[in-house]
Amino acid sequence: MPERRTVALVTLGCARNEVDSEELAGRLEADGWQLVEDAEDADVAVVNTCGFVEAAKKDSVDALLEANDLKGHGRTQAVVAVGCMAERYGKELAEALPEADGVLGFDDYTNISDRLQTILNGGIHAAHTPRDRRKLLPISPAERQSAGADVALPGHGAPEGLPEDLPEGLAPESGPRAPLRRRLDGSPVASVKLASGCDRRCSFCAIPSFRGSFISRRPSDVLGETRWLAEQGVKEVMLVSENNTSYGKDLGDIRLLETLLPELAEVDGIERVRVSYLQPAEMRPGLIDVLTSTPKIAPYFDLSFQHSAPDVLRAMRRFGDTDRFLELLDTIRSKAPQAGVRSNFIVGFPGETEADLAELERFLTGARLDAIGVFGYSDEEGTEAATYGHKLDEDVVAARLARVSRLAEELVAQRAEERVGETVHVLVESIDDEEGAVGRAEHQAPETDGQVLFTSGEGLTVGRMVEAKVVGTEGVDLVAEPLPGSLVCTEEAGR
């Protein structure tokens, strides 16, 4: 009988990383590894790192060091780094952090079981030398689908040579290109990867260099994975990628998302479909119409504004201004008055003036956003912005970050108060003795946004869609009272 091998996956960063972790979990379980929840109970602790900004990289290093500490007094024998930080730095990370017994890039994912076994046996798998993954796919989007078969794209394709009899609950059951995937929690919400990579050239962002050029998954693959997730009890799927508004451009149809969304909404068992990561400059009337008028599609707009002062946006290699952004929001709300909108912003960008900051504050005040993320600028190596002059002192960036963060906190609390009296459709996500029943309405995405606190959990169950009336707020969170007969009909859920 083969020796029992255990592995734990520790996931940091965004929802895309969560999908990648479930792919790794699926590959490992298919090859006989036993998944455990806690790293201290695992032979190998795999840390799926984030390489987005400095704070995220620090969190990733801390998680690796914490896992390494387990080797002295527990079952853990090896610690392995995967994910964006591992891909971005490769050999450099391995040399700087000897506590990690292995640093694996995206090209290692299809052979993750063999890689971990080698490391567990005391062997060494040489870390890769990082390369610009944008160069792995053709410049022309039309040529990428055929070339993509030879490029590692986490979350896109099934590995070769899988055993015919996969363990129960392990994808794919719904098509040859659905990714091998094992859910790591019992949440009624799951992310589905719509695409990978990004063709935008924002001057502050390094993500395209290690995630590559934009490439869409085929609609049949996305539908197949969504059906499988519904069979696992998922009620809400959130479509993720670096830029969902570009979906289909490499498949010959830039409006493919408008066609796909109604099909996803018709999947049996799915109560809500949410779209994240939308670019304001790529929004189009047809997409707004589908997002605001299709049953079971959340009227939710995760718009990447980043700033609103024209000079700063130009330096960021982005487009728009305060008035155009406000006009976009007016268009959305004219079609769906209760639509949810969230965005992230960078303050202290090189060359940002007090007038620029005031313009951003004007936009934030007028935008009535439901959730706001604010980040202070810091150089990211390999980016155009890192070469800019006119850098602001760190204390100036910190002061502006604190100033805009305070304003953002006030504004999202005000926006929550505006929702008092509204009727919302809430997916119940957890029920416990301490917090009671908690869920999320259409305008609230997992992790990043607020939530709904029910006044009573009586009769509620996790995964149930409930109609409730907002009766109060706690900061950005809503307090809501379930309405009598509040099980929402699936045809109405999401509207």
From Swiss-Prot:
InterPro entries: Elp3/MiaA/NifB-like_rSAM, Methylthiotransferase, Methylthiotransferase_CS, Methylthiotransferase_N, Methylthiotransferase_N_sf, NA-bd_OB-fold, Ribosomal_uS12_MeSTrfase_RimO, rSAM. [4Fe-4S] cluster 2 binds at C198, C202, C205. It is found in: Cytoplasm. Its EC number is 2.8.4.4. It holds the Pfam family Radical_SAM. It comes from the Bacteria. [4Fe-4S] cluster 1 binds at C14, C50, C84. GO terms for cellular component: cytosol. Residues 417-484 form the TRAM domain. Keywords: 4Fe-4S, Cytoplasm, Iron, Iron-sulfur, Metal-binding, S-adenosyl-L-methionine, Transferase. Belongs to the methylthiotransferase family. RimO subfamily. This is Ribosomal protein uS12 methylthiotransferase RimO. The gene is rimO.
